[in-house]
Amino acid sequence: MPVPKKKTSKARSRRRYAVWLGKAKLQAQRAMTIGRAILSGRNTGFYYPKAKSEEEEGEE
């Protein structure tokens, strides 16, 4: 089984971790932006199923 020849340096592992955290932060920011757009009614660029109103439920 292959194994690494040398130990990964602290600087390299911290840099990788920082990149990973940055990507996670960006995804969280995008999710919050989309959520705000949906709640404020400014959403035009994507589709999501709307909840049925009480009037529509009575018809079925």
Swiss-Prot record:
Cellular component terms (Gene Ontology): large ribosomal subunit
Keyword field contains Ribosomal protein: yes
UniProt-listed InterPro entries: Ribosomal_bL32 (IPR002677)
Disulfide pattern: none
GO BP terms: translation
Keyword hit for Isomerase: no
Entries under Pfam families matching the protein: Ribosomal_L32p (PF01783)
Record's keyword terms, sorted: Ribonucleoprotein, Ribosomal protein
Gene Ontology molecular function terms on file: structural constituent of ribosome
Superkingdom of the organism of origin: Bacteria
Family listed: Belongs to the bacterial ribosomal protein bL32 family.
Descriptive protein name: Large ribosomal subunit protein bL32
